[in-house]
C-alpha cells in the first residue's frame, strides 16, 4: 500500500469538490496544505519532564554527542534533528534566531554554553528560536525529530518560585519554552514521552491538554535514568545481585507506568541512556580492559563491603577509605582516571559488571541493562518503519475534521441562507405591479445567481458523505496494515511457541496479505482455523502469543466476511 499516493489522490478529489462549492475561498488552501503535508517527513516529538534525560536519550538513540548533557538544566530552546550531510563538522548545529537574522552554523561549545541560568546565558537563549542538527542517519530520511525543553519547567514553577522571583527574565524564558514545547508537541505526528522512574501527576494533564491526539498508535513511553534507582535489598547482598534487583525494580516501575498511561502510550520501556553511551565510549576507546584490571585489584572479599554507592569514599583524599584503596594499588589519581567524566551511578554499574564478569559478557550485560537496544527496536517498529502511515493518518484525521465541520456547520448555515432567500424571492414576486417589474426581476436574478439552491446543497451533502466514507475506508485500510504489521513482528518473537514450520507458514501468508494464496482458502477452512486459533489463544500463558492470535482470528474473520 502506498499511503502517500492514496492519501494525496483522495485529497485531490476533495480539493476538486471544494473548488466547485461556495466554500472555495475558505477551505481550498487548507486542503491544499493537507496535500503538501502528506508528503513531508513525519514529525516525532520528544517530550517529557525537565531533567528526564531527553538530551542523553537523543545522543544514545542517534549515536551522537551533540545535544548538551549535564547536571545543570539546559536553557536552550527547541532542538530539531533533520536528515542531511553536515557541511562543516566543526559547526554541526544551525542556530535560527528570533529576530529574522540568517541561520548561523555554530560549534558544540556554543551548545554547551546554553546550560545554566546566568544572565549571560538567558540573554543568549532569548534570541534563539530553535537549534537545527543535520544528521546523516537514514532513520531520519522520513522523520524529523524535535526535542522539546520539558513541560514541568513551568507547570511546576512553584518548586523554584524564589529563584524565578529574583529572575523575571528566567520566568519569561520558561513561559516561552513551555508554550513552544506544547505547540510543537500538539502539532507532532507522533510522540516519545520521557519520564523519570516516577511520573509526575501533571503528566496526565499534559497529555489531555497538549497532545489530545495521543494514543498507543502514535506514542511510546520511556522511563529514563534507571541507573538512579537504589535497590531495596538485604544487608550482605552481592553487588551483581543488587544490579539484578535494580533491573527487576525498573521493569516493575515501567510496567506500572505503562498501565497508568495505557490509553495514551503503546508501551513504557526502562532505559539508561547515559549507561549505554558510556559503555560504547569505554569499549570503543579500548579502556574497558584497563578499567577491569584496575577494579579487580580490590580483593573479592572486600569488594562488596568497600565498593559502595558513596562517591565521597571513592574520591577520599585521606582517611580509612583512601588508605584501603591505596593498599589495593589505587591511589586517588588512578581512581579519578578510572571514573573519568562518567556519572557516578553509571560508573558504579559498569565497575560492578567488569569486576564480576569477563569483558565480553560484561559489555553484553551492560548494554542489555541499559535497555537502549530494546527501545531502538520498538521505535524502529513503531515509528521509523511506519512514518508514512503515521503522517498520512494524522493528515487524514485533520482533513476529516474539516469535512465534518463543513457538513455540520457550514451546510446548515448555507441552508438557512437558502431558506431566507426563498422567502425574499417570494416577497419580490409578490411585489410585482407595485414596483418597477424590470428592477424586481433583475434583483431576483442577482439573488438566484449568487446563492446555491436547496438541490445543490443536497448534492454537496451527498458528496461530503461519499468523501468521508472513502476517508474512513482508507483509514481502516491503514489500521489493518498496522495490525498485520504488528502481527508479523509478534510472529517472529513467538515462533518457538508454534507447532512447527507449517503453522508458521500459515500465519505468515495470512499476515502478509498474499491475496493469491488467500483467495484459495474456503469459508470452511477459514472458519475451522479461526476456531482452532481462538482455542489456542484461550489456553496460552504467553501475552505476546495471545496478542498475535487475536490478530490472526480477526484476519480470518475478515476473510469469512468476504466469502
Locate each region found by the language model:
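Short acidic, glycine/serine/threonine-rich helix-capping segments at coil-helix boundaries
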Residues: 509-519, 537-546
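Intrinsically disordered, low-complexity coil segments
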Residues: 85-91, 164-187, 236-241, 404-438, ...
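Charge-dense, extended regions
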Residues: 538-562
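Short, glycine/acidic-rich hinge or "gate" loops at secondary-structure transitions
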Residues: 271, 390-397, 541-544
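Extended helical scaffolds that flank P-loop GTPase cores
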Residues: 2-45, 264, 280-514
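Short glycine/proline-rich, acidic loop/turn segments that cap or connect secondary-structure elements
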Residues: 343-352, 522-533
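Globular "head" domains of long coiled-coil molecular machines
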Residues: 5-12, 16, 34-318, 369-381, ...
